[in-house]
Each structure stands twice: as C-alpha cells, then as structure tokens.
Design a protein with these regions (language model features):
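Generic structural "secondary-structure junction" signal
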Residues: 15, 20, 26-28, 58, ...
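Phosphate-handling DNA/RNA-contact segment within nucleic-acid enzymes
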Residues: 31-133
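The Walker A/P-loop phosphate-binding site
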Residues: 197-220
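TOPRIM metal-binding catalytic domain and adjacent DNA-binding surface shared by DnaG-type primases
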Residues: 1-41, 84, 193-200
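Generic hydrophobic, helix-prone segments enriched in Leu/Val/Ile
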Residues: 1-4, 21-23, 56, 77-79, ...
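Residue-level preference for alpha-helix termini and adjacent loops
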Residues: 67, 79, 95, 167-174, ...
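Exposed alpha-helical structural elements
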Residues: 8, 12, 150, 170, ...
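TOPRIM fold recognition
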Residues: 88-91, 96-200
C-alpha cells in the first residue's frame, strides 16, 4: 500500500472518540468515487477470506467513505484482532468506527463489513471458518430498519445473534452519548440470553398449583 503510513491523531477517529488510535493514513491526495481524499485521511485495508489484500476503504474527516474501483467488496473485510474470548466469540460490525468501539469495549475480535449489504456474505464466511464460535452482529439501529433487518438475516444464516444499540444509530453513537461503562454494559446486556420463564420447564397448570413460596423460588 503505497502513499500510506501508520499514525495516530486522525481527525475522523478523534471525532469518533479515538484520538490516540493508530491507523493507516494517506500521505498524498487520491480521488475515487467522485471524492478527493487527502493526506491524513483513514485507509482501511480489506482482505479476502484467504488473507489477501483485495481493496481499501478511504474515509475522510467528514466521514465520507469510498472503496477503490475494481477492488473486491463482497466477502472482503478488515479484522481488528482481540485477545479476549479468542476462538469463542467473534463480532461483525458495519463500519470501522463501530468495530473500533466494540473492540475497545470488549477486547474481542471484530470484523468490519463496511456496509449492511456485506453482512450476510461475511457472516456465512465467518461461520465456515469458525464453526465453534459465537458470532455476534453488532448491528446499526436504523430509522428505516435496514440495519436491523440485514443483521437479522445474517444472524439467521450463521446461527448468530444480533446486538442492537439502545439508540438509533450505531454502537459508536451510543459510546459518544453515554460513555464507555454504560455502553459496555449495554452491549453485553444485548447478547445475554433471556431469563428462563418457569413455563419453559413446566405447564401453566403445574405452576398454578404450586404454593406461593414455591412460585417465588421458581421466578427468582
């Protein structure tokens, strides 16, 4: 990747809450998709499932994003490696800043899908490569429902789960609005299995016939 260098202090990532994060940045102007990217803009390397570099995503200080014409997008991703839950849980997020947020809060590995359109193919590839992993779609909560719907379809395809942020937008929006601790709690709450109802293990008639103290024990 010529005309790039690793550095921190990127304007876009600073706005997203990560001023000290080191990323790959442009060192020269590059025009693609009708947008002129400048030195200091983010470069997100994208790899296929074999680990070959197949494209990059460029992000300017305003958050405009483009991939290079002719490069692979479907099934391509950027991976932020984590040490916690390695081999046990894998996250997939739409955007780079969202993925950074999830990684920062969990310490776990996160795949960057670039867009909701790529979630399905990426989730399927992830399941093939990691058959024993829990796969979590760190979805966007869109006003039009697009992020939620595509994440749900991807989760169905890979037998994964969806973690929706409590606010409209993405997990980075939650992070900026509510801070790290509250967002960390929200993200783990989103993937916690629901409490088992007493009716899951007995009939309603059996539950009704129990004494008040027995019911209390069952519910709590």
């Amino acid at each position: 990747m010529e005309k790039t260098r690793p550095a921190s202090g990127n304007a876009y990532l600073t706005r997203k809450g990560f001023p000290g994060h080191e990323c790959v940045m442009l060192t020269a102007t590059h025009k693609t998709g009708g947008v002129t990217f400048r030195a200091g803009d983010v470069v997100v390397p994208l790899y296929d499932d074999a680990g070959a570099l197949v494209n990059v995503q460029l992000i300017n200080s305003d958050g405009l994003k483009r991939t290079l014409k002719g490069g692979q997008v479907k099934g391509a991703c950027h991976i932020i490696e984590g040490k916690k839950q390695a081999g046990k849980r894998l996250w997939i997020a739409e955007g780079y800043a969202t993925a950074l947020t999830v990684h920062h809060l969990t310490g776990e590995t996160v795949m960057v899908a670039l867009s909701s359109v790529n979630l399905l193919s990426l989730a399927s590839l992830a399941r093939q490569k990691h058959p024993a992993c829990q796969i979590v779609l760190a979805a966007d909560r869109d006003l039009n429902g697009d992020g939620q719907n595509k994440a749900a379809a991807a989760a169905d395809a890979c037998e994964g789960v969806v973690a929706l942020p409590p606010v409209f937008g993405d997990w980075n929006d939650t992070f900026k609005q509510h801070g790290g601790e509250a967002t960390r709690k929200a993200i783990y709450d989103a993937i916690r299995p629901p409490a088992q109802s007493p009716f899951d293990t007995m009939s309603e008639a059996e539950f009704t016939a129990m004494s008040t103290s027995e019911k209390a024990m069952r519910v709590h």
